[in-house]
């Protein structure tokens, strides 16, 4: 099967989602900050909201692939199972004494059961209920409800850990410790799952590499015309962008990258929290963003990159030039600064385009939705009171794997 994402707005054909599950029940007021959520979720309501999101997509002929299903099916393949467990259950993470019983337990699980443990985590008590353990300093120092294998609630935001860039995929190095293990699951899926293993596609970046070179998919927007827009943000570093750029340029698919220097704040952790593409040459942008400095990266000979720094006032011109259009159509909702800040916090600009001029957004951002509608954008709304507590909207919660090319 072919996988390709040539733009942010081409007709969406296939997408990876993750329906929130028992990993959300591991969130507590005490650990939510470490796990990068602003509050604990009401799981049943979050699942209802996510199901509505999926129904909107399937109602527009989008094939929805669920991460948990892909992972469970992948883990039935012995090589994939060993790859994941060797990296997740080992002496470095669990200590020598606890590793053997935990590995024995996980080795004996079905693919679906193992996927559940990898995503939802496992506590000391849950391990001891299932298997006897020798004396272990690691276990002795833990309470019964302490997590020997932490959960991965941020798998909800499938955009970040992997993103398809033109004809290949970037499996991303994550900035925060709470998300680093997500990458291992995606690497196994793309390498061994039958849906992907039979296809040939470039892997632009491998996510388990160590060091400060991080890239997260929420900062990556494939705007078309061989160009990519990337945020230099709280989660994506200049080192990561340069590493990704060198591989994209070597692949010959991308001809330039526009890096946007963002404010490093929680509210604006990724580029897609403040701007997304909604139609040809058209972006919805948070009113409080202003114009930011940009840097244009282009290939320059063998393994070389040229970098041009652009003034903040040239931001729109630089993006338009990369797109090959005369100018951008920038849609900024006219509202006071307090209303704008509230809607940005609630992911008002975090829209998922499923076709040119057709987007999915949270229903709560009434001002932005009405403004976009008045400017010819078809806005499909979904509830997000619970799923939005991790600071992510429809764009964050989706990893497109196939879009139609723009005419």
Describe the predicted segments one by one.
Residues 1-407:
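The feature marks the mature, well-folded catalytic cores of soluble enzymes
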């Amino acid at each position: 099967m072919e996988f390709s994402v040539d733009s942010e707005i081409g007709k969406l054909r296939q997408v990876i989602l993750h329906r929130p599950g028992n990993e959300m029940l591991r969130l507590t007021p005490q650990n939510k900050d470490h796990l990068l959520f602003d509050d604990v979720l009401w799981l049943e309501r979050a699942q209802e909201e996510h199901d509505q999101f999926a129904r909107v997509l399937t109602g527009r002929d989008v094939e929805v692939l669920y991460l948990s299903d892909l992972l469970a099916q992948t883990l039935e393949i012995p090589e994939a199972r060993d790859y994941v467990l060797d990296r997740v259950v080992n002496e470095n993470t669990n200590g020598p004494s606890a590793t053997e019983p935990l590995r024995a337990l996980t080795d004996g699980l079905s693919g679906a059961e193992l996927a559940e443990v990898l995503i939802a985590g496992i506590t000391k008590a849950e391990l001891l209920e299932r298997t006897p353990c020798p004396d272990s300093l690691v276990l002795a120092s833990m309470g019964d409800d302490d997590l020997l294998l932490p959960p991965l609630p941020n798998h909800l935001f499938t955009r970040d850990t992997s993103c398809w860039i033109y004809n290949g995929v970037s499996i991303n190095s994550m900035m925060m410790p709470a998300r680093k293990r997500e990458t291992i699951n995606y690497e196994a899926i793309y390498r061994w799952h039958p849906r992907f293993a039979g296809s040939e596609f470039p892997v632009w970046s491998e996510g388990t590499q160590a060091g400060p070179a991080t890239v997260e998919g929420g900062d990556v927007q494939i705007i078309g015309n061989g160009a990519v827009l990337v945020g230099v943000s709280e989660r994506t570093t200049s080192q990561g962008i340069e590493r990704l750029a060198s591989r994209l340029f070597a692949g010959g698919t991308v001809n330039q990258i526009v890096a946007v220097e963002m404010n490093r704040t929680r509210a604006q952790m990724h580029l897609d929290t403040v701007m997304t593409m909604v139609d040809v040459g058209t972006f919805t942008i948070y009113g409080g963003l202003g114009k930011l400095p940009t840097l244009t990266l282009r290939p320059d000979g063998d393994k070389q990159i040229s970098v041009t720094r652009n003034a903040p006032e040239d931001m729109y011109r630089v993006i338009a030039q990369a797109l090959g259009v005369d100018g951008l159509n920038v849609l900024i909702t006219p509202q006071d600064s307090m209303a704008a800040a509230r809607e940005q916090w609630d992911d008002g600009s975090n829209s998922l385009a499923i076709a040119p001029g057709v987007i999915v957004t949270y229903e709560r951002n009434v001002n932005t939705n009405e403004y976009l509608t008045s400017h010819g954008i078809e806005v499909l709304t979904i509830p997000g009171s619970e799923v939005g507590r991790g600071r992510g909207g429809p764009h964050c919660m989706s990893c497109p794997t196939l879009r139609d090319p723009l005419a």
